[in-house]
C-alpha cells in the first residue's frame, strides 16, 4: 500500500496526496501519531479524510496510510453493559491503557476484550448444512441476553468441526466446509457501519412498545419496529423522555447513543441504570444496555460515525431475534457535524447551510429500523425501534433537520416549552403531537385487553381538544359565560392533564405505569366525566357536583401513586364514583329549588 502525504489540514478535514491506491470510505492512519480517519472524497490522487480524533499539531508532510478497510464494528460477546466512543473504542479500557481521564490520540485499542473467556454451547452438529444467519451456538452473555453466534453473511456449507467450552472471541470455535474449501470461524464478526445488515423480509410493525409513560402509550403509541422523533427546545425534557424510555420500554436491548450532548447526561445513565431493576425481567437495567458516548467536547467527525455504530450493533442483535430500541440524543448534533464537514469540503449548501443530502442521510438511518424476518433457517423475527431527539434552535420545528426527520418517522412527540415552564412533564403537547400507528395499536389492544381501549383514547382526546376551544372563550368572556356542561368538560380535561398525562419520572411508583393500570386510570377519569354529565342533564348543579365529589376527585388524583399490586382499589373507586354521583342526583338539583 502506498504511503500518502498530508498537504492541508483544516480542522477535522485533512487532504493527502499520493493516495491513488485508496478507495472512498477506507480507514486511514493519519500523521506521525496515527490518528484514525475515513476517506470521504477522492479527486485524482488527493483524498479528503475526516479525522475522528483531535488534529492539533498535525501538519503537512506527515504520512497517511490507508488500511484498505471501511469503518467497521466488532460484533461478538462482550458488547452488553459496555460504554464505547463513536468509533467503538471501549472507554473503560481506554482509561486503563492511558491512565488518563481524557481521550489520548493515536491509541490503538481492540473494541472487545480478547482475553476474557466465554462459554460456547454448540446448537448444531458436525455434518449439518448451514448458511448465512443460521445459529451455530449460544453464549450466556448476561442473565437476560443469550448471545447467539450466527454464520457470517456470504458463507454456506456443511459444519466440518465445532467445539464446546470456554473460548476467547478470536479463537476458532467452528469450521464450515464450503465450495472454496474449509473455512474456520471464531465468535466474532466484523461489519461495515455504513452498510445495513441483510434481512430476509421486512414486516409491517403492529405490536405496541410499552414505555410506561402514559401520554405516549395512550395517545401517541409507538410500535416495535417504529421510528419516532422527539423535537423540542432547550429544557423541555428531551433527554429525560429518552432516559425514561430507555429504562422502562419492554424491549430486550437498548442502545443509547449520546451524540454531541452533555457528558453529564451519560454520567447519569452510568450512575442510575446499574441500580434500577427492569420490571419485566427483575435484573439490573445495565444488563440490557449498550452505551455509545460521543459528548459535545469530543471530535465533531466522530459524532457522524457514532449513529452508524449504534444502529449496526442494534441490527446485529435484531438478527438474533431480539427487539432492540436505539436512542439517539440528538440527531441535530449529528446533522451539525455533517454541515461542518460539508462546509470544509466546500460543497454547495442547502437550507440553513446543511448539505443537500441531509434528507437522504436521515432517511438512510431511520430506514434501518423496522420489524424484520432475519436470515437463517428458523425465520427469527426481530425489530429495531428508533427514537431520536431533535434539538431545533429556539424550538423552531420548521428548520431542516426536524422537517426532514418528520418526513421519514411516523411518530412525532412535540415537546412544548410552555408546558415545561408550567412544570408539566413529560411536556409532550397533545394538540401538536401525532402517531400514525394509533389505529393498529388500538385494534391490537382492544383484543389484548378485551375492552374498548380505542374508544376510551378517542374520548380522552376529544375532551382535551374541546378544552382548548373552551379556553379561547374563557380568555375572551370569562368562565362564568360557560354552561355547567362545559365547565364539567374543563374539569374532566384538567383531571386528564394533571392526574393522567403528568408523570413524575423521579417517583418510584409513578415513573412506570403498566398498560392495565393505564386503562383503569383512564376509565376512572372518563367515568367521572360521563356520570357527571348525566347528573347535570338530570338537573344537578355544577357547584353541587363539585362540592359532593371533593374526596372522589382527590382519590382519582392520587391513583397514579398506587402500586401495581393494589389495582383492585381502582375497580372499587370506579364503583364509588357512580354511587357518589347517584347520591348527589338524589339529594340536589331541581329537588332543592
Curated annotation (Swiss-Prot):
Any one cellular-component term (Gene Ontology): proton-transporting ATP synthase complex
S-S pairs: none
Gene3D superfamilies: 2.40.30.20, 2.40.50.100, Bovine Mitochondrial F1-atpase, Atp Synthase Beta Chain, Chain D, domain 3, P-loop containing nucleotide triphosphate hydrolases
Pfam family, one: ATP-synt_ab
Domain of life: Bacteria
Enzyme class, spelled out: translocase
Catalytic activity: ATP + H2O + 4 H(+)(in) = ADP + phosphate + 5 H(+)(out)
Keyword presence, RNA-binding: no
Entry binding sites for ATP: 232-239
Keyword terms of this UniProt record: ATP synthesis, ATP-binding, Hydrogen ion transport, Ion transport, Nucleotide-binding, Translocase, Transport
Biological process annotations from GO: proton motive force-driven plasma membrane ATP synthesis
E.C. no: 7.1.2.2
Statement: the UniProt record of this protein carries the keyword Transmembrane helix: no
Gene Ontology molecular function, alphabetical: ATP binding; proton-transporting ATP synthase activity, rotational mechanism; proton-transporting ATPase activity, rotational mechanism
Function per UniProt: Produces ATP from ADP in the presence of a proton gradient across the membrane. The V-type alpha chain is a catalytic subunit.
Family under the similarity heading: Belongs to the ATPase alpha/beta chains family.
Name used for this protein in its record: V-type ATP synthase alpha chain
Gene: atpA
Amino acid at each position: 500500500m502506498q504511503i500518502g502525504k498530508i498537504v492541508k489540514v483544516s480542522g477535522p478535514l485533512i487532504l493527502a496526496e499520493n493516495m491513488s491506491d485508496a478507495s472512498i470510505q477506507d480507514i486511514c492512519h493519519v500523521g506521525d501519531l496515527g490518528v484514525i480517519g475515513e476517506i470521504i472524497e477522492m479527486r485524482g490522487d488527493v483524498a479528503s479524510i475526516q479525522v475522528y480524533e483531535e488534529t492539533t499539531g498535525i501538519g503537512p508532510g506527515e504520512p497517511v496510510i490507508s488500511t484498505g478497510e471501511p469503518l467497521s464494528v466488532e460484533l461478538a460477546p462482550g458488547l452488553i453493559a459496555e460504554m464505547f466512543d463513536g468509533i467503538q473504542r471501549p472507554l473503560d479500557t481506554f482509561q486503563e491503557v492511558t491512565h488518563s481521564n481524557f481521550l489520548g490520540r493515536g491509541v490503538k485499542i481492540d473494541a472487545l476484550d480478547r482475553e476474557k473467556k466465554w462459554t460456547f454451547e454448540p446448537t448444531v452438529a458436525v455434518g449439518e448444512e448451514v448458511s448465512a444467519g443460521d445459529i451455530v451456538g449460544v453464549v450466556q452473555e448476561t442473565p437476560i441476553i443469550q448471545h447467539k453466534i450466527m454464520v457470517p453473511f456470504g458463507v454456506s456449507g456443511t459444519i466440518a468441526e465445532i467445539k464446546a467450552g470456554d473460548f476467547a472471541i478470536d479463537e476458532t470455535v467452528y469450521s464450515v466446509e464450503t465450495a472454496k474449501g474449509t473455512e474456520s470461524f471464531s465468535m466474532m464478526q466484523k461489519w461495515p457501519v455504513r452498510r445495513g445488515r441483510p434481512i430476509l423480509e421486512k414486516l409491517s410493525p403492529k405490536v405496541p412498545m410499552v414505555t410506561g409513560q402514559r401520554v405516549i402509550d395512550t395517545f401517541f403509541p409507538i410500535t416495535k419496529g417504529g421510528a419516532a422523533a422527539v423535537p423540542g427546545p432547550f429544557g423541555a425534557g428531551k433527554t429525560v423522555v429518552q432516559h425514561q424510555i430507555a429504562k422502562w420500554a419492554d424491549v430486550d436491548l437498548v442502545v443509547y447513543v449520546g451524540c454531541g450532548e452533555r457528558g453529564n447526561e451519560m454520567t447519569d445513565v452510568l450512575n442510575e441504570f446499574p441500580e434500577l431493576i427492569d420490571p419485566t425481567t427483575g435484573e439490573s437495567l445495565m444488563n440490557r444496555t449498550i452505551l455509545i458516548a460521543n459528548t459535545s467536547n469530543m471530535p465533531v467527525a466522530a459524532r457522524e460515525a457514532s449513529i452508524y455504530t449504534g444502529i449496526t450493533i442494534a441490527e446485529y442483535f435484531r438478527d438474533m431475534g431480539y427487539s432492540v430500541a436505539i436512542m439517539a440524543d440528538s440527531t441535530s448534533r449529528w446533522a451539525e457535524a455533517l454541515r461542518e464537514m460539508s462546509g470544509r469540503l466546500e460543497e454547495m449548501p442547502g437550507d440553513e447551510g446543511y448539505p443537500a443530502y441531509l434528507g437522504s442521510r436521515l432517511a438512510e438511518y431511520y430506514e434501518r429500523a423496522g420489524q424484520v424476518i432475519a436470515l437463517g433457517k428458523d425465520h427469527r423475527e426481530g425489530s429495531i425501534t428508533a427514537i431520536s431527539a431533535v434539538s431545533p434552535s429556539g424550538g423552531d420545528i420548521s428548520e431542516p433537520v426536524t422537517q426532514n426527520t418528520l418526513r421519514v418517522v411516523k411518530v412525532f412527540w412535540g415537546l412544548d416549552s410552555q408546558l415545561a415552564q408550567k412544570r408539566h412533564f413529560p411536556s409532550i403537547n397533545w394538540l401538536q403531537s401525532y402517531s400514525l400507528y394509533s389505529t393498529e395499536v388500538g385494534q391490537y389492544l382492544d383484543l389484548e385487553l378485551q375492552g374498548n381501549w380505542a374508544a376510551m383514547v378517542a374520548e380522552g382526546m376529544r375532551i382535551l381538544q374541546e378544552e382548548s376551544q373552551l379556553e379561547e372563550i374563557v380568555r375572551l368572556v370569562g368562565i362564568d359565560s360557560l354552561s355547567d356542561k362545559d365547565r364539567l368538560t374543563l374539569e374532566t380535561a384538567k383531571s386528564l392533564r394533571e392526574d393522567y398525562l403528568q408523570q413524575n419520572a423521579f417517583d418510584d411508583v409513578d415513573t412506570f405505569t403498566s398498560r392495565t393500570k393505564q386503562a383503569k386510570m383512564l376509565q376512572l377519569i372518563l367515568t367521572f366525566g360521563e356520570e357527571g354529565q348525566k347528573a347535570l342533564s338530570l338537573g344537578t348543579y355544577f357547584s353541587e357536583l363539585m362540592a359532593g365529589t371533593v374526596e372522589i376527585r382527590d382519590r382519582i388524583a392520587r391513583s397514579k401513586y398506587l402500586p401495581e399490586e393494589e389495582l383492585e382499589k381502582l375497580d372499587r373507586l370506579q364503583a364509588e364514583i357512580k354511587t357518589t354521583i347517584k347520591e348527589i342526583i338524589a339529594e340536589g338539583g331541581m329537588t332543592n329549588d
